Each structure stands twice: as C-alpha cells, then as structure tokens.
C-alpha cells in the first residue's frame, strides 16, 4: 500500500491518497481549527467562548458514536473521570503529588473491567481476573510477567513510535495493528492484551480515544479534549490553537 500526503503552505496535512484515490481531505481556518475532515464532515466552533474548542460536528458518514462522553478534570487539568452513559462505561483515574498517573479503573454497571497501576514504563493490569505486569524496556522490548513467568517480546514501530506489530521469542506475531494519518487504530491481532498503540500511548478503545498522559486525544476528530497550557513554538501561529494536535501535522510531530 502506497500512500501520498499533501500539505498546505503552513505545513498542515490537507490530503491523503491511497494510490490515485483520495481517501482523506482536511480543510482549516487560518487559526488552525479544522473546518472539514473526511469521515466527520463539517466542524463548528463558538468564536466568542473557547474559539478553538469544537462545539459540533456533522458526522456525515456516521463514524462517530451516538453516545455522549462526560469528562471531568482535577484542579491541575488532569482527566479524572470519563463516562459513557450509553455504554454504561466509567473510567476513574488517580494521580500522585507530581500529577503523574497512579492508577485507572474501568467499570461497566459498577463492575470492574480493568484496573491499571502506572509507574513510568511499568504497568500492572488486572483484566478478566488475570493480572499481567508490563515492562516497556529500551530497544522496543516488552517484558510481560504473568503467574510468575516472564516472557520477552519485541515491538516493531513506525517513525512516530506507533506500535505496528509485536513478536514473541520464537518469532511468532502476537500483535498487529495499523493507523490512519490521525492515529485511528485498527487491530487485527492482540494475543497479549496490549493497550498501547499510537505513538506508544494508551489506547482507550472502549471510548475510541487515546490517553496521552497530559490530555485526551480524539483521533477521529483530530483534536484534543482540553487545551494545552503551554506554547512550545511561539514563532508558529498554529501553536496558539490550544486544541489542535501537533500543529495539524500528525505525520511529523508527536505529543
């Protein structure tokens, strides 16, 4: 599969072609707001109140779930609750004094589905009654410990650090995934219950969003849920859009 990507004079992604077929088109306002995106349709914003936050999308192709996500944040702007009432799903997150994630708990109808404990590149995940410890090591190695046994796997990533496949010590593929230009993931194999993916971040597939530690990202919209408090590139006008993802150039930058 050969893809070709087009950009405007502000280095923003405006088109994706698969062969000769255009599979995605994106248009922008001068301030970096997405106005149209294939698969979503037209975007609306409130120019008077939070002018960079999406208020409504057309959902032209019906790819956006009809249920509503409720979110709440702590005093430091970190996500502490995600709730999808339509699916009866709820995720609570806790943080340490340095505002690094300590844990998250996913539940449905008050019944626990998955509990995760975080400590840097270590995760302890309890899911379906099974506890696994994940160690993300240098050189794209992943050590997974379960029932006292540790197995070593090798992850293969793209230039952005997105995990494309994982193989075990015998060379057997145990994970396989692909991503569109904005990070929407398609998983075709996952024998190790891996929850990381796009740019190495945690995929919250139950909510169709990505937890990028600091903020939540929607790969369908190509926008963040909350604003960025920092302007890293003050000489770039697009960096003042506090909800845009990577200056609207998702194939070049990571968050």
Language model features: what each stretch is:
Residues 1, 254-255:
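Short, intrinsically disordered, charge-balanced linker/junction segments flanking boundaries
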Residues 1-152, 170-174, 188-194:
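Acidic/glycine-rich beta-solenoid
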Residues 43-45, 147-213, 220, 242, ...:
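A motif-centric feature for acidic-aromatic and gly/ser/thr-rich catalytic loops and repeats
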Residues 78, 100-101, 213-215, 223:
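Short, cationic motifs built from Arg/Lys/His that form the positively charged side of catalytic pockets
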Residues 86, 122, 202-203, 216:
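Short, flexible loop/turn elements at secondary-structure junctions
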Residues 204, 231-232:
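Short histidine/acidic/glycine/proline-rich micro-motifs that form metal-
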Residues 233-238:
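Short linker/helix segments within small regulatory modules
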């Amino acid at each position: 599969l050969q893809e070709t990507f087009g950009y405007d004079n502000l280095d923003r992604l405006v088109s994706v072609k698969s062969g000769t077929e255009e599979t995605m088109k994106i248009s922008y306002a001068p301030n970096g707001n997405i106005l149209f995106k294939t698969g979503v349709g037209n975007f609306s914003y409130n120019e008077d109140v939070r002018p960079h936050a999406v208020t409504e999308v057309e959902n032209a192709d019906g790819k956006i779930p009809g249920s509503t996500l409720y979110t709440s944040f702590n005093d430091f702007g970190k996500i502490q609750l995600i709730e999808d009432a339509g699916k009866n799903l709820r995720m609570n997150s806790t943080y340490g004094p340095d505002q690094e994630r300590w844990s998250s708990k996913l539940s449905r109808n008050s019944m626990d589905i998955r509990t995760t404990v975080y400590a840097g590149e270590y995760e302890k995940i309890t899911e379906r009654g099974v506890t696994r410890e994940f160690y993300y090591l240098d050189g794209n190695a992943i050590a997974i410990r379960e029932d006292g046994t540790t197995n070593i796997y090798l992850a293969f990533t793209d230039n952005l650090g997105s995990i494309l496949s994982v193989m075990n010590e015998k060379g057997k593929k145990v994970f396989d995934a692909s991503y569109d230009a904005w990070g929407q993931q398609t998983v075709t194999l996952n024998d190790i219950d891996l929850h990381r993916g796009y740019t190495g971040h945690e995929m919250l597939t139950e909510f169709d969003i990505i937890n990028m530690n600091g903020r939540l990202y929607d790969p369908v919209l190509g926008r963040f849920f909350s604003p960025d408090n920092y302007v890293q590139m003050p000489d770039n006008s697009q960096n003042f859009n506090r909800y845009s993802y990577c200056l609207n150039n998702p194939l070049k930058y990571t968050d």
